[in-house]
Swiss-Prot record:
GO biological process, one term: arginine catabolic process to ornithine
EC number: 3.5.3.6
Name of this chain's protein: Arginine deiminase
GO cellular component labels: cytoplasm
Active-site residue list: C395 (amidino-cysteine intermediate)
Metabolic or biological pathway: Amino-acid degradation; L-arginine degradation via ADI pathway; carbamoyl phosphate from L-arginine: step 1/2
GO molecular function: arginine deiminase activity
Superkingdom of the organism of origin: Bacteria
């Protein structure tokens, strides 16, 4: 704890003892999902929201029982809106899209939102708003209003806020606000940006990788060791984003080596952490199908710029960058069909709460059994509804404080 009683902020590994984390408890934004929009909003099914909330509460309880401070994004957003007029202006500006709803309706909507209490505004910014819910009659001045159905969204919901890993992550003492690849998630970064800019808890926090538009998502970034970062490039993070992030962390002295790891561009492996996560300081759990083929380009900070080498096998490149003899892979020993099923259900997407202790979905029975057989303690949580958006415990968490290794 520091003098204010808060946990000092900063993260330099995947497995250092977890002290504080940001989660987002599923809310009304999930109730906006319908068979008509779930694909567009990146959910494979319509979750049972009450059960998803129960599962998420269990996740938060498991973390708290291990001494982790759990901060909820909706609370942080409400608190920031309460203390800062600038936060309100920022949130409203990001939510009111004149390109979609036109100038006339945009003015009406912004004027209404400026009068809303912080808690209600927080809910609108995350859960969205339909035309029927807009308590003003702009029909006489807005063609957009007249031509839309009442159930259409004047502000789109953000159901993927559940996955707090993607819109921000920490490298050392700095926070990085990302640029998300798909339009359904683009506004999530404005929520996290607002919280970090205006919530008192984050006063004085410095940022890295600012003012970049090339896509980078936190699920593609693994802090393999202090100074060593892996960045997946695939469906979400682009080569341009990975290079910009690498150069940024080099310039800020946050890393000496970055491994850029190409991954297959498909939904099942949308992020690097869907196929590989760290469970100990020298060990990973990895989807067996890619173990022998995953490669990496090695970028290093040099006196005269940045050197690029490779591609070479990922496990070799990682061990070399980390200064260890070998990066161990927990042998799940799964047959092809079981491995594919459990990878789809985020069996490799674990969250380490300390070295050798991870949170995982209980449904991935075989992967969890192999982890335990290798000496890893597995804290099981339910995920039948949470998994509808294709994300596991690591996806659903943004660590903001870990102990150094």
């Amino acid at each position: 704890m520091n003098a204010s009683g808060s946990v000092p902020l900063g993260v330099d590994s995947e497995v250092g003892r977890l002290r504080s984390v940001i989660l987002h408890r599923p809310g009304d934004e999930l109730k906006r999902l319908t068979p008509r929009n779930n694909d567009e909003l990146l959910f494979d099914a319509l979750p049972w929201v009450d059960r998803a909330q129960e599962e998420h509460d269990q996740f938060a309880t498991v973390l708290r029982e291990r001494g982790v401070e759990v901060l909820l994004l909706s609370d942080l957003l409400t608190e920031a809106l309460e203390v800062s007029g600038a936060a309100r202006i920022q949130g409203i500006a990001a939510a009111v899209d004149a390109r979609k709803i036109g100038h006339a309706l945009g003015q009406h909507l912004a004027a209404y939102l400026r009068k809303v209490e912080p808690k209600e505004l927080s809910s609108i910014l995350t859960a969205g708003m339909t035309f029927d819910e807009l308590p003003i009659d702009a029909g006489s001045t807005s063609l957009v209003r007249r031509m839309h159905h009442g159930g259409d969204f004047v502000i789109d919901p953000l159901p993927n806020l559940l996955f707090t890993r993607d819109s921000s992550f920490w490298v050392g003492p700095r926070v990085i606000i990302t640029s998300l690849a798909l339009s359904a998630r683009a506004r999530e970064s404005s929520i996290t940006d607002l919280v970090y800019a205006h919530h008192p808890r984050f006063k004085g926090v410095r940022r890295a990788y600012e003012s970049h538009t090339a896509p980078v998502e936190g699920g593609d970034v693994l802090l393999l060791a202090p100074g060593v970062i892996a960045i997946g490039v695939g469906e979400r993070t682009s080569p341009a984003g990975a290079e910009a992030l690498a150069r940024s962390v080099f310039d800020d002295g946050l890393a000496h080596t970055v491994l850029v790891v190409p991954i297959e561009q498909r939904r099942a492996s949308m992020h690097l952490d869907t196929v590989c996560t760290m469970v100990e300081a020298d060990a990973v759990v990895m989807y067996p199908a890619i173990q022998d083929t995953l490669a990496a380009f090695t970028l290093r900070k040099e006196d005269d710029g940045v050197s690029i080498r490779g591609a070479t096998p990922f496990l070799e490149a990682a061990a070399d960058a980390m200064g260890i003899g070998k990066l161990r892979v927990i042998d799940t020993g799964l047959d092809t069909v079981t491995a594919e099923r459990e990878q789809w259900d985020d069996g490799n997407n674990t969250l380490a709460v300390e070295p050798g202790v991870v949170v995982a979905y209980e449904r991935n029975v075989e992967t969890n059994a192999r982890l335990e057989a290798s000496g890893i303690e597995v804290l099981r949580i339910a995920g039948s509804e949470l998994g509808s958006g294709r994300g596991g415990p690591r996806c659903m968490s943004c660590p903001i404080a870990r102990d150094p290794l």
